[in-house]
Amino acid sequence: MRIDQSIINEIKDKTDILDLVSEYVKLEKRGRNYIGLCPFHDEKTPSFTVSEDKQICHCFGCKKGGNVFQFTQEIKDISFVEAVKELGDRVNVAVDIEATQSNSNVQIASDDLQMIEMHELIQEFYYYALTKTVEGEQALTYLQERGFTDALIKERGIGFAPDSSHFCHDFLQKKGYDIELAYEAGLLSRNEENFSYYDRFRNRIMFPLKNAQGRIVGYSGRTYTGQEPKYLNSPETPIFQKRKLLYNLDKARKSIRKLDEIVLLEGFMDVIKSDTAGLKNVVATMGTQLSDEHITFIRKLTSNITLMFDGDFAGSEATLKTGQNLLQQGLNVFVIQLPSGMDPDEYIGKYGNDAFTAFVKNDKKSFAHYKVSILKDEIAHNDLSYERYLKELSHDISLMKSSILQQKALNDVAPFFNVSPEQLANEIQFNQAPANYYPEDEYGGYIEPEPIGMAQFDNLSRQEKAERAFLKHLMRDKDTFLNYYESVDKDNFTNQHFKYVFEVLHDFYAENDQYNISDAVQYVNSNELRETLISLEQYNLNDEPYENEIDDYVNVINEKGQETIESLNHKLREATRIGDVELQKYYLQQIVAKNKERM
């Protein structure tokens, strides 16, 4: 079977490879390209690159990649024709296949695709009923009085379901769709006594609900006459699952990636108004708590999430619960606190679009700052709560991945407890550590190293200095750790504290992607080991290793009996100082030989 080349080109032009790959891979911008862990093979260091300019992807490890069709073929393990059809469905391009064999070879639409087609066909009918019929005039006036322009109504595909039990039913039946499938799609309801079917949505303003690819998979029908419920949503179906759907994600995804932030609101109406006001990276759940599936998808797009829930007690409680969960999941969490009793729609209606966008830009707090401001009265007047929340907030701050954001949170939170940021940092470092971490001895017990004072780090041997510098570079970058971890025998460390830190780093990087001292100290429960970690944190060393610098440290630690260029240069200078020509000649030959080895 063959597909017309113009169709293939249209699908390729309408499919952004960055959006496509982002559904499977968490990508980070590196220069002009994006990089992430390859979805086709296991790896710890990202080697999968996506070029937005060239619209291609490539893995430097397993060599797989290509354009949007080749990526889809690989990720779904399907043929080229199937990949074209799938991507065509994604961007609403019909794929006409010229069969070289009988028509039976042409793949018909799946039930899921037929369900989506039903939703998209009836949307056109609903839109017509709202904008072109007498019956829809009252609903249209209701929308216009609430700031919905004709352009916004068209952009969002808003429609009207007439007050008829068979409007949708008859329309779909005339189009040749199976009525039972329309019921399973959530467009119809069923009388369980006589098994007759009737419209689920009647006399309601219809808001289409789209999946991440922009396909309509459900509806939310809003009353405009005061009937209950206020909003009637599609039921759970094979194509509409609330735990997987974030309203407006299809429109907001590019802005989320560009701004490296997603803003979560309570309802889709707030999203529509916020988006119209100029806030383009907004989404909302469909009346449910943020699910694990939601969080997984968000983490593929960004590590920064801002909560902007209603300014009432329920909104505050939801913010605390949701924010705590997101923080535990390793995301950077921020909060925009709306004035009491207001939601985004009401704020925009009262103050206008410009005031709203300025408020959002200038009134963003870390979750820890928001939480302590909510609890401030209890902290101030209840000593038991003071201790409890001091520990809670210390733990919350320790979960933050950015050391810069941690320091800002320390500065913001400390005054609520009448302590200095340094004292709060000490609470994090010394009282939040979990179970003991010591290496095991031959009997299975734990050995605590002999005490060593911070001052003793100023009197290290040449070998210990190499160990310290080596660890410092490993602490700065996970990729460096992964590249060099197996190059060193831990038993070759002469400083036992450094040896234990080396082992701590192994455990730390097994669970974390980026090193920070607040997280690392939780992997030890020894004052001496914590002191060593803090000393290494404070140790000043060049940010980027010089050429072969780390290799030199590895050689020293492993005691390979090979002089480093640094030590040979030092000995050459000493031989020159004392005037020993033979030694000068010897060390110069050694330096030349070592430089040749590196070439």
From Swiss-Prot:
All copies of domain Toprim, residue ranges: 260-341
Domain comment as written in the entry: Contains an N-terminal zinc-binding domain, a central core domain that contains the primase activity, and a C-terminal DnaB-binding domain.
Subunit structure, interactors included: Monomer. Interacts with DnaB.
ZnF CHC2-type: positions: 38-62
Keyword Transferase: yes
Enzyme Commission code(s) on record: 2.7.7.101
Stated family: Belongs to the DnaG primase family.
Protein name: DNA primase
Signal peptide: none
Reaction(s) this enzyme catalyzes, per UniProt: ssDNA + n NTP = ssDNA/pppN(pN)n-1 hybrid + (n-1) diphosphate
Function: RNA polymerase that catalyzes the synthesis of short RNA molecules used as primers for DNA polymerase during DNA replication.
Gene from which the chain derives: dnaG
Alphabetized Pfam families for the sequence: DnaG_cat_HB, DNAG_N, Toprim_2, Zn_ribbon_DnaG
Binding residues annotated for Mg(2+) 2, in chain numbering: 310, 312
Transmembrane domains' residue ranges: none
Enzyme class: transferase
Protein's UniProt keywords contain NADP: no
InterPro entries: DNA_heli_DnaB-like_N_sf, DNA_helicase_N/primase_C, DNA_primase_core_N_sf, DNA_primase_DnaG, DNA_primase_Znf_CHC2, DnaG_bac, DnaG_cat_HB, DNAG_N
Organism: Staphylococcus aureus (strain COL)
Cofactor note: Binds 1 zinc ion per monomer. Binds two Mg(2+) per subunit.
Organism superkingdom: Bacteria
Residues bound to Mg(2+) 1: 266, 310
Gene3D superfamilies with a match to the protein in the record: 3.40.1360.10, DNA primase, catalytic core, N-terminal domain, DNAb Helicase, Chain A, DnaG, RNA polymerase domain, helical bundle, Zinc finger, CHC2-type domain
GO molecular-function term, one example from the UniProt record: zinc ion binding
CDD domains according to UniProt: TOPRIM_DnaG_primases
One GO CC term on file: primosome complex
Keywords tagged on the record: DNA replication, DNA-binding, DNA-directed RNA polymerase, Magnesium, Metal-binding, Nucleotidyltransferase, Primosome, Transcription, Transferase, Zinc, Zinc-finger
Lineage, broadest ranks: Bacteria, Bacillati, Bacillota, Bacilli, Bacillales
GO BP terms in the entry: DNA replication, synthesis of primer
